[in-house]
Structures are given as structure tokens and as C-alpha cells.
Curated annotation (Swiss-Prot):
<comment type="similarity">
    <text>Belongs to the ATP-dependent AMP-binding enzyme family. Bubblegum subfamily.</text>
</comment>
<dbReference type="InterPro" id="IPR020845">
    <property type="entry name" value="AMP-binding_CS"/>
</dbReference>
<keyword id="KW-0436">Ligase</keyword>
<feature type="region of interest" description="Disordered">
    <location>
        <begin position="1"/>
        <end position="20"/>
    </location>
</feature>
<dbReference type="GO" id="GO:0042759">
    <property type="term" value="P:long-chain fatty acid biosynthetic process"/>
</dbReference>
<keyword id="KW-0221">Differentiation</keyword>
<dbReference type="GO" id="GO:0006631">
    <property type="term" value="P:fatty acid metabolic process"/>
</dbReference>
<dbReference type="InterPro" id="IPR042099">
    <property type="entry name" value="ANL_N_sf"/>
</dbReference>
<dbReference type="GO" id="GO:0007283">
    <property type="term" value="P:spermatogenesis"/>
</dbReference>
<dbReference type="GO" id="GO:0005739">
    <property type="term" value="C:mitochondrion"/>
</dbReference>
<feature type="binding site">
    <location>
        <begin position="418"/>
        <end position="423"/>
    </location>
    <ligand>
        <name>ATP</name>
    </ligand>
</feature>
<dbReference type="Pfam" id="PF23562">
    <property type="entry name" value="AMP-binding_C_3"/>
</dbReference>
<feature type="binding site">
    <location>
        <begin position="227"/>
        <end position="235"/>
    </location>
    <ligand>
        <name>ATP</name>
    </ligand>
</feature>
<feature type="binding site">
    <location>
        <position position="624"/>
    </location>
    <ligand>
        <name>ATP</name>
    </ligand>
</feature>
<dbReference type="InterPro" id="IPR000873">
    <property type="entry name" value="AMP-dep_synth/lig_dom"/>
</dbReference>
<feature type="compositionally biased region" description="Basic and acidic residues">
    <location>
        <begin position="1"/>
        <end position="14"/>
    </location>
</feature>
<keyword id="KW-0472">Membrane</keyword>
């Protein structure tokens, strides 16, 4: 029986014979059965990442591929140069003793060197292993050991010192460390600058590298992505060559990224490449369809992203909800400072924009004459101010986008399509874009993939399960964890609860692991309640519902604050929107401390008023928020409360603020 015939039917069950590959493996050198369809999408010929790269060079060789800022100018590499420099890096990695299916750990902000190290690792027969720049030394050590990392590529001395603080006996697999930015401050054997590292491979003949490349198979592991560990310890998600190459092609088709001679799409890389969403959008799709990737500055998320966007003017853009929320805040602050006439024009244009774009979303194309005026007066100016004036496709991913933010941008002629998925399905499972769009929906299933709602209730709500060539190989070294998410028929269980409408649009309603079960046995999904609180109370930055096994629900709140431009840490000072909110109420507060010190009565009353509105919409008494507390500091990645894509780390927050939570239930 061929692999195709075995894998085409998701109801067939696992292949349990030892002679043939199974649908899953937990070994880094394992091979899996590819889930090819009989025909159509999902039936494409499997290819390795080196084969994809070679095809890209043949098609786009002279086009620019990567661009990085050097002073005031951008240095670029063409696709041909990109491939050559990756081969050079691969030979250097072989020279350093990189073993087959062992990791190359990359620790630092997005850069040309990050991507070259990733591709170099794969060409050399190793595994690309991204390590979050915000990881502690202990977290780095866990990844190094688990992924058998042979070579570490670090950004700067700060990251180097983090690695050097790990006892050598905890890094026995590491043979060399390379620093790719800033001069080396240390001098020891097996420690190299990027320039010296790139010359090491000159002694390795090209034919030796070619043999390694030719020996690779599409059903073998190429990339390990570590889950950010919002619950429990991180797991190494093994993605095969086919996972990457097929998903990149399927996603590019879905979002209509097609290379046209003489035109080139562009993207700005700023979300951590250790995360699958950024890696797919910034590395793999660009190789597949010839996109030019610009690298933002390391402080992009601390305020400089907008300047890069204004300079580069990308044609498609992916933001996590927190990025879109920050953009929304900026627009609101600018409008608040404008004249009354401009405020009226903005409000009029928004009202018209929401009406027209909602109709467009439903397939109606009748555009009123005054829409052009709204576009000229408001929409074009907003896009230009954000650096998105050349952008044809806008996305949000990693966590749900609120209705408030989605409709705000829709009203400004910026329809944000949501991408739903997980690391374990190579990133996307459903996609919502300008041609497949509904507010609050995650769109439709990626062409060539299958969706199932497991254990549906009477309302058609069940656990989202996935099947297709995007489904991962398994968790590295964790068979029990792998079999928890892959059932006996090979379906990937997401842990997310969702429903499909009559047009097959998927809506996610909650996450099984995040559900709060009250003392009375009620199941409460926190995200809809938290989202509503943030919508109704403009001063709130983060809201986290608590009350598992408790008699009633309580909530932790943080206020919108300025952030330190250097560290990214939230400051005590309120941001402009929060200060305007206070002034509107008659409060003189300009810091969080000002509000907490005197339990500012007008601010507390306004927050309680917003909570009351949320409670009025509760489906039952058990869904109402009884108590709440304002924390002294906003949540942040640096503070540990948020993951790398700004998701709430609920377990950690619950532990960190245990005293405050206990106090709400004891008082």
C-alpha cells in the first residue's frame, strides 16, 4: 500500500506496523507517513526545504530577498545571494561538527543572520531551533538539552552572558557558540564572531554539503518550535520538511500571494521568529513566492515599528491583537488632539466605513459616492500614518481579536483577517482574508485540510480537530503528550472549543484548559468576558478572570500605561488615552499610583459602571464579576505575565498575584 493510500482517509486509523512509518514520531530522526490527498489541494508533490529553496532561486534569483537597516540605508541580498550565504553557513556548521538531526539554537531578535542560521542548519542536515530572546538561562538550558543543540547562535553579549551562566555540564551537546551582532567581549575556544564563523566552512567541499542535502526526505524533521509554555513546561513541536513547504504554499494561495513579474510583495519581520506565525510569514512564504522581507529594529515593539512601516510600506502585514490594540490607541490619541471639525469628519467616515465594509464582507459591492470623500479625508491618511498605505492584506493571529478592535479597523477600511491555528498545525488551520471574511470569525479551513468538531453539543459547539499535511510530527521525546493531542485516527485535537456557521466560517468560543469551573460546577469561558470588560472600560489594558473552584468570579485589572522605550517595561505613568479618560471623569490622575493611593473615587466608580454593564450581559448569575482589583503594574513580556505573542500566562499570573487573589476571596 502506498503512503498516499494509507494517509488519504482520516478514518483509517494509525499505521501500527513497525515496518512502515506512522503518522507520528517523537524522535528527531524519525520519519512519518505524509497525509496526501487523493487529488486536488493536499495532493501536491512533497518537497524538502532545500528543494523549495532551490526552486525559489531558479524563479526569483535576481529579486531582492532580505533587507536590513545599515545606518540610513537598507542592505539587501537577492535570492541567489541568500541561497549562497545559507550554503556557506551550512558548510561552517558542518565544520563545527553539527550532527544530523541535532539542533542549531538561535537566540536573538529577527535579523538576516537569524534566517541564514536557520536555513544553514537545515541545509546541513540539522534542525532549526529558535529560542525566545526573553527566555531565562534556565529556559534556554532546557531547550539546549532537549533538542541536542550542537551550535548556539546568539545575538549579542547580553544573550551570550545568559548562555555562559549555564553550567558547562548542563550543555554537554554544545560544540560552539557564535555571536552575530556587536563585537565579541569574550575570548575563548569555540566562541566565534559571525564573520569568523562564516569563513570556517571554506574547507568543506560543496559536494559534501550536496550529499547531505540529497539525503534529506520530506517526511523528516526540519524545524523544532517550542511552545511558549503558558501552561506547564515548553514542548518541542517537530515540524517536517513537508509541514513547512506544503503549508507555505497552501497559505500563499489562500491569501492570494502570487508572484507577478515586475511586482514584488514585501513584509516587515518583527514578531519573534521562534514563533511559528512569524516564521511562516517572514521566512517560508517569502521563499515560496518571492517576497522581500525587511527586518525591523530590535525595539520594534517598544515604539519603532511604525517608523519602519512608514519607511518600507509593506504590502501585507501580520499583527498580534496587542499590536492592533496599540495602533488603535495611537489613532484615538491623535484624533483626541485634533480640531472639532476633524473629529466630526473622522466619526462620519468611520460610520460610513463600517456600513460599506460590512456590506462588502457579505459580498455586496455597491459603494456610495461619498465613500471616495471618506477615503480621501480619513482612510488614506490613517493608513499612511501607520505605514500601511501600500498594504492589501491585513492579518491578526496568535490569539483572538476583539470585536471592538476588529470593527474599529473595519470602519477605517482596514479589514483584519484572523488566522486561527496552532504550532502543532504548522501555524494556520483556518484563514479569514478580504475574500473570506466575517467579523469575529477565524475564516474557513485551509484548502486541502479537514476540520471536525468533536463531541458537539446541541448548539453545534465542540472541540476543533484538524487533519491535513499541516499536522505536526509529534512532540520531541514526549510520546504521552503526543498521544494526548493525536487520537487513534490521527486527528489533532486543538483543545479549543468552536462552532461552524451555515457558510462554514469557524468561530472559536473558548479553550478547554482555560475554562474556569466554579464551586457550583458552572463552566465559565474567560476570554469573552475579559474582552467585553476591555471594550466597555477604555482605561483597562489587561483583564484576567479568576474564580476556578471558587464561589464567585473576580478579576485582575491593569491600566493603560506608557512603556520604557529601552526595556519595554510598563511604567507607572498612564498613557494619553488613560489620562484623557481620567480628565473626562474629572480626575487629575496621571499615574497608576495616583489612582491606587486614594482609590480615586471617580475612576473606581467608572470602572464599576463598566463592570455592571458587562454583568448585565451575563448569561447567568455565576458569570457575573463580583470583585475586582487594579494591579500596580501592567502585564508585560518582561514581567513574565505575557508570552512572546502577548498571550496571558494564566498559571504564572495566578501564582504571581496569589496574595491579591486570596485577599479578594477572604475579605
Amino acid at each position: 500500500m502506498t503512503q498516499e493510500k494509507k494517509a488519504e482517509d482520516p478514518d483509517r486509523g494509525m499505521d501500527t506496523t513497525s515496518a512502515a512509518p506512522r503518522l507520528w514520531s517523537t524522535h528527531c530522526d524519525g520519519e512519518v507517513l505524509l497525509r496526501l490527498s487523493k487529488h486536488g489541494p493536499g495532493h501536491e508533490t512533497p518537497m524538502t526545504i532545500p528543494e523549495l529553496f532551490q526552486e525559489s532561486v531558479e524563479r526569483f534569483g535576481a529579486y531582492p530577498a532580505l533587507a536590513s537597516k545599515n545606518g540610513k540605508k537598507w542592505d539587501t541580498l537577492t535570492f541567489s545571494q541568500y541561497y549562497d550565504v545559507c550554503r556557506k553557513a551550512a558548510r561552517s556548521l558542518i565544520k563545527l561538527g553539527l550532527q544530523r538531526f541535532h539542533g542549531v539554537g538561535i537566540l536573538g531578535f529577527n535579523s538576516v543572520e537569524w534566517v541564514v542560521a536557520a536555513l544553514g542548519a537545515i541545509l546541513a542536515g540539522g534542525l532549526c531551533v529558535g529560542i525566545y530572546a526573553t527566555n531565562s538561562a534556565e529556559a534556554c538550558q532546557y531547550v539546549i538539552k532537549q533538542a541536542n543543540v550542537n551550535v548556539l547562535i546568539v545575538e549579542n553579549d547580553q544573550q551570550l552572558q545568559k548562555i555562559l551562566s549555564i553550567p558547562p555540564d548542563k550543555m554537554e551537546t554544545v560544540k560552539a557558540i557564535v555571536q552575530y551582532r556587536l563585537p565579541l567581549m569574550e575570548n575563548s575556544t569555540n566562541l566565534y564572531s559571525w564573520q569568523d564563523f562564516m569563513e570556517l566552512g571554506n574547507a568543506i567541499p560543496n559536494i559534501q554539503l550536496d550529499r547531505v542535502i540529497l539525503s534529506q526526505k520530506a517526511n523528516q524533521c526540519a524545524v523544532i518550535i517550542y511552545t511558549s509554555g503558558t501552561t506547564g513546561s515548553p514542548k518541542g513541536v517537530m515540524l517536517s520538511h513537508d509541514n513547512i513547504t506544503w503549508t507555505a504554499g497552501a497559505m500563499a494561495r489562500e491569501i492570494e500571494l502570487i508572484h507577478v513579474s515586475g511586482k514584488q510583495d514585501t513584509i516587515v519581520s518583527y514578531l519573534p521568529l521562534s514563533h511559528i506565525a512569524a516564521q511562516l510569514m517572514d521566512i517560508w512564504i517569502p521563499i515560496k513566492v518571492g517576497v522581500l522581507t525587511f527586518f525591523a529594529q530590535p525595539d520594534a515593539l517598544r515604539g519603532t515599528l511604525v517608523y519602519t512601516l512608514q519607511e518600507v510600506k509593506p504590502t501585507y502585514f501580520l499583527g498580534v491583537p496587542r499590536v492592533w490594540e496599540k495602533m488603535q490607541d495611537t489613532i484615538k490619541e491623535n484624533v483626541a488632539k485634533s480640531s472639532n471639525l476633524r473629529k466630526k469628519a473622522f466619526a462620519w467616515a468611520k460610520m460610513l466605513g463600517l456600513k460599506v465594509n460590512t456590506k462588502k464582507m457579505l459580498g455586496k459591492r455597491d459603494i456610495p459616492m461619498n465613500y471616495r470623500m471618506a477615503k480621501a479625508l480619513v482612510f488614506t491618511k490613517v493608513r499612511t500614518s501607520l505605514g500601511l498605505d501600500n498594504c492589501h492584506t491585513f492579518f491578526s493571529g496568535a490569539s483572538p481579536l476583539s470585536q471592538d478592535v476588529s470593527e474599529f479597523f473595519l470602519s477605517l477600511d482596514i479589514p483584519i483577517g484572523e488566522i486561527y491555528g496552532m504550532t502543532e498545525c504548522s501555524g494556520p488551520h483556518t484563514v479569514s482574508c478580504k475574500s473570506i471574511y466575517r467579523v469575529l470569525s477565524c475564516g474557513k479551513v485551509l484548502n486541502g485540510c479537514k476540520n471536525m468538531l468533536y463531541k458537539q453539543n446541541k448548539d453545534g459547539v465542540g472541540e476543533v480537530c484538524m487533519w491535513g499535511r499541516h499536522v505536526f510530527m509529534g512532540y520531541l521525546g514526549k510520546e504521552d503528550a503526543t498521544l494526548e493531542v493525536l487520537d487513534e485516527d490521527g486527528w489533532l485535537h486543538s483543545g479549543d472549543i468552536g462552532r461552524l456557521d451555515s457558510h462554514d466560517f469557524l468561530y472559536i468560543t473558548g479553550r478547554i484548559k482555560e475554562v474556569l469551573i466554579t464551586a457550583g460546577g458552572e463552566n465559565i469561558w474567560p476570554i469573552p468576558i475579559e474582552t467585553l470588560v476591555k471594550e466597555k472600560i477604555p482605561i483597562i489594558s489587561h483583564a484576567m478572570l479568576v474564580g476556578d473552584k471558587a464561589k464567585f468570579l473576580s478579576m485582575l485589572l491593569t491600566l493603560k500605561c506608557e512603556t520604557d522605550q529601552m526595556s519595554g517595561e510598563p511604567l507607572d505613568k498612564l498613557n494619553l488615552e488613560a489620562i484623557s479618560f481620567c480628565q473626562m471623569l474629572g480626575s487629575q490622575a496621571v499615574t497608576v499610583s495616583d489612582i491606587l493611593k486614594i482609590r480615586d473615587p471617580v475612576v473606581y466608580t467608572a470602572i464599576q459602571y463598566g463592570i455592571d454593564i458587562v454583568n448585565q450581559q451575563a448569561v447567568s448569575d455565576s458569570h457575573r464579576i463580583r470583585k475586582w482589583i487594579i494591579l500596580e503594574k501592567d502585564f508585560s513580556i518582561q514581567g513574565g505575565e505575557l508570552g512572546p505573542t502577548s498571550k496571558l500566562k494564566r498559571d504564572l499570573i495566578t501564582q504571581k498575584y496569589k496574595a491579591q487573589i486570596d485577599n479578594m476571596y477572604s475579605s
